[in-house]
Swiss-Prot record:
Belongs to the IlvD/Edd family. The modification N6-carboxylysine is found at K124. The gene is ilvD. Functions in the biosynthesis of branched-chain amino acids. Catalyzes the dehydration of (2R,3R)-2,3-dihydroxy-3-methylpentanoate (2,3-dihydroxy-3-methylvalerate) into 2-oxo-3-methylpentanoate (2-oxo-3-methylvalerate) and of (2R)-2,3-dihydroxy-3-methylbutanoate (2,3-dihydroxyisovalerate) into 2-oxo-3-methylbutanoate (2-oxoisovalerate), the penultimate precursor to L-isoleucine and L-valine, respectively. This is Dihydroxy-acid dehydratase. It comes from Nitrobacter winogradskyi (strain ATCC 25391 / DSM 10237 / CIP 104748 / NCIMB 11846 / Nb-255). One of its GO terms (molecular function) is 2 iron, 2 sulfur cluster binding. Pathway: Amino-acid biosynthesis; L-isoleucine biosynthesis; L-isoleucine from 2-oxobutanoate: step 3/4; Amino-acid biosynthesis; L-valine biosynthesis; L-valine from pyruvate: step 3/4. Homodimer. The keyword Metal-binding applies.
Length: 614
């Protein structure tokens, strides 16, 4: 029987000093025998996905106390990728994932917490907390802040759904008036919550449902809707029960590593492929698997991508479908239900809320549930009122979208595509693989070839695109932007958005050892491994070299002979200290924090996790 971790600091004569400090936080004699639950919050006024979390930690804390636990809240940092995008601030985004994971470990281990509720939402916060949960392996429940309502704007007399990607594309399109750009800007992000499409934040919050670590609805019910409050209330009660089951009944089934097993990671990746999730999820699932000592690799992702169809298409893959529409169609449990019927997931696995995923689907899949309350839950609709306040509206759709032939969520027979929404490509330019979001690629360019336009930084590529120096048929290649070369593996949302704004979204490709925002679409190939800074072949590409992409056959090929590549490699190595570094100087300032990250990070093919030798 494992002892409560917290008793290290709450029991015994020698802990009188520690108990004195606990008493100063409000604890009383009767509290020293209760489980201490960390409420890991991430409120900040910098991020719309987190502005409404300030009071939600205390909401969970009160429910923990009602259930017989002691709640102690702390906050992690949270970077807004959209605000950090397009300048050196993006160098800090991916490294912040490790900082978040470490900070959770530091706080939870330093204070001997028994379990935790993780209140996350945006891009690197959910992955960072997930990594910490699997690293610590103490009872954990995830509850996110929820998705933002989609924006609505009237242009030329027509109402259109918009998000921040539309604002970025419009701003760089000379044919769009200043007035229309401002109208889109003002409408794109109308409420608190994570941006409304299937971008990285929402993708990860959906995947926590598939991993079994979050309650049904976590990925899809809107931040503004009153129904979301129930998730926070339930999380507070559930975590106390889980702590007691583990520490008092020796029930290891509630531990993160028991729930998020190899098969659970397969389920999560299957979901991701089926809904065309962000390519960043590949990085984050690989990193979480590493922390949990789960042998889940790029090879598994490649294998799954070849058999899983696209059952759901959401912005940015399609313009007018957002998370509120996915929720109306049954949310993530609806997609998992279809994957289960197609025999593509293992529904026997446990979750934090049910004995098995199959048991959960019987209640939460709208195609099989007999519960009217569940059906009502999935009618939660946007309120259409600008607000930063959680749970502030209770609008409902008149009916569910249960059409699995033509609706938002399809069954396998009526899939949007028999080929999955993410793919791993291999070739001489990416020996260890690279990633493309196939759900966002137009069918006309699933095979594509063109001359390389080589850039040593994202900034240089942006200048060329906006300067009209990129032509139809070009392959924009951006290198030295990987985990080590950036450092920090910047997102390339601006280059992909600007290609769209120039009318080149279906006429050009972009390949990089950096990564893409969940908002990126088009023929955008990222995570090229090995990266240029590690001696990858992407560092040997020269202007005009032909690069060919064959997504159906999972291939990418640099049309340069092996002998020529070896000659170029030898010439590069002869540069000594200047080898495998940008040829042109870059103005970015690399601080000590970024240097420390670069010194220990690994390849994107490994999730860009940090490895420190013993």
């Amino acid at each position: 029987m494992p002892a409560y971790r917290s008793r290290t600091s709450t029991h015994g004569r020698n802990m009188a000093g520690a108990r004195g400090l606990w008493r100063a936080t409000g604890m009383k004699n009767e509290d020293f025998g209760k489980p201490i639950i960390a409420v890991v919050n991430s409120f900040t006024q910098f991020v719309p996905g987190h502005v409404h979390l300030k009071d939600l930690g205390q909401l969970v804390a009160r429910e923990i106390e009602k259930a017989g636990g002691v709640a102690k809240e702390f906050h992690t940092i949270a970077v807004d990728d959209g605000i950090a995008m397009g300048h050196d601030g993006m160098l800090y985004s991916l490294p912040s994932r490790e900082v978040i994971a470490d900070s959770v470990e530091y706080m939870v281990n330093a204070h001997c917490a028994d379990a935790m509720v993780c209140i996350s939402n945006c891009d690197k916060i959910t992955p960072g907390m997930l990594m910490a949960s699997l690293r610590l392996n103490i009872p954990s429940v995830f509850v996110s802040g929820g998705p933002m309502e989609s924006g609505k704007v009237t242009l030329n007399g027509k109402v259109k759904s918009v998000d921040l990607i539309d604002a970025m594309v419009a701003a760089a399109d000379d044919s769009v008036s200043d007035a229309d750009v401002e109208a889109i800007e003002r409408s794109a992000c109308p409420t608190c919550g994570s941006c409304s499409g299937m971008f990285t934040a929402n993708s990860m919050n959906c995947l926590t449902e598939a991993l079994g670590l979050a309650l049904p609805g976590n990925g899809s019910v809107l931040a503004t809707h009153a129904d979301r409050k129930g998730l926070f209330v339930e999380a507070g009660h559930l975590i106390v029960d889980m702590a007691r089951r583990y520490y008092e009944q020796n029930d290891e089934r509630v531990l993160p590593r028991s729930v998020a097993s190899f098969k659970a990671f397969e389920n999560a990746m299957t979901l991701d492929i089926s809904m065309g999730g962000s390519t960043n999820t590949v990085l984050h699932l690989l990193a979480a698997a590493y922390e949990g000592e789960v042998p889940f690799t790029m090879a598994d992702i490649d294998r799954l991508s070849r058999r899983v169809p696209v059952l759901c298409k959401v912005a940015p893959s399609v313009a007018d479908v957002h998370l509120e529409d996915v929720h109306r169609a049954g949310g993530i449990m609806g997609i998992l239900g279809e994957l289960d019927r197609a025999g593509l997931i293992d529904a026997s696995l446990p979750t934090v809320h049910s004995n098995s995923l199959r048991e959960a689907l019987e209640r939460w899949d709208i195609k099989r549930t007999k519960s009217e309350s569940v059906r009502t839950f999935y009618t939660a609709a946007p309120g259409g009122v600008r607000t930063e306040i959680a749970f502030s509206q209770d609008k409902r759709f008149e009916e569910l979208d249960a059409d699995r032939a033509k609706g938002c969520i399809r069954d396998a027979e009526h899939a949007f595509s028999k080929d999955g929404g993410l793919a791993v490509l291999y070739g001489n330019i990416a020996r260890d693989g690279c990633i493309v979001k196939t759900a966002g690629v137009d069918d006309s360019i699933l095979t594509f070839s063109g001359p390389a336009r080589v850039f040593e930084s994202q900034d240089a590529a942006v200048d060329a695109i906006l300067g009209n120096r990129i032509k139809p048929g070009d392959v924009v290649l951006i290198r030295y932007e990987g985990p080590r070369g950036g450092p920090g593996m910047q997102e390339m949302l601006y280059p992909t958005s600007y290609l769209k704004s120039k009318g080149l979204g279906k006429q050009c490709a972009l390949i990089t050892d950096g990564r893409f925002s969940g908002g990126s679409s088009g023929l955008s190939i990222g995570h090229v491994s090995p990266e240029a800074a590690e001696g990858g072949a992407i560092g040997l590409v020269e202007e005009g070299d032909l690069i060919a992409f064959d997504i159906p056959n999972r291939k990418v090929h640099l049309d340069v002979s092996d002998a020529e590549l070896e000659r170029r490699r030898a010439a590069m190595e002869a540069k000594g200290d200047k080898a495998w570094k940008p040829a042109a100087p870059r103005t970015r300032r690399i601080t000590m924090a970024l240097k420390a990250y670069a010194a220990h990070t690994t390849s994107a093919a490994l999730g860009a996790v940090r490895v420190v030798k013993d």
